[in-house]
From Swiss-Prot:
GO cellular component: cytosol
Membrane spanning residue stretches: none
Classification of source organism: Bacteria, Pseudomonadati, Spirochaetota, Spirochaetia, Brachyspirales
NCBIfam families listed in its UniProt record: PRK05412.1
GO molecular-function term, one example from the UniProt record: nucleotide binding
Name the UniProt record assigns to this protein: Nucleotide-binding protein BHWA1_00627
HAMAP family to which the protein is assigned, alphabetical: YajQ
Cross-referenced CDD domains: YajQ_like (cd11740)
Keyword Nucleotide-binding found: yes
Cited InterPro entries: DUF520 (IPR007551), UPF0234-like_C (IPR035571), UPF0234_N (IPR035570), YajQ-like_sf (IPR036183)
Keyword Nucleotide-binding: yes
Record organism: Brachyspira hyodysenteriae (strain ATCC 49526 / WA1)
Amino acid sequence: MAKDPSFDIVSEVDMQVIDDCVNVAVKEIDNRFDFKGQNIQIELNKGEKTITILAPADFVLNQVRDILFQKFIKRGLNQKCLREKKKEKAAGDAIREINEIVHGIDKDLAKQIVKDIKDMKLKVQASIQDEQIRVSGAKKDDLQAVITMIKGKDYPIPLQFTNYR
């Protein structure tokens, strides 16, 4: 007999898509008339999984972040995949914002998701496996109900479903 149907809940981001979004945003910022002559930088560090934005003022920083988020939306990325790590003063009056790219589900959120699944009182098992959650059950309908519930809730990171078996 075959194993019970299952799927994994993960939070993954394609770094190549983020790299493309950053490059397109940098090109748009370089071509915008209202940003001419200003020291604005967006840097992607793939090793540390961070995006650093440098802007001369807080207002400009917000505009640059909005441009970056527009590029994320066009490419189908959720803006929840960026978490502000720290905002600091840079040289002169400039402001530097370091954003962390969320990758994987942390333990506290994983426990909350498993609790939410168990509160549904369906015959499914949810187990935390490193930075993902495996959900298995006898009926595919129960698994689909779990997916619907998770999509309906607003978690602080984007979640995807993989490894349907």
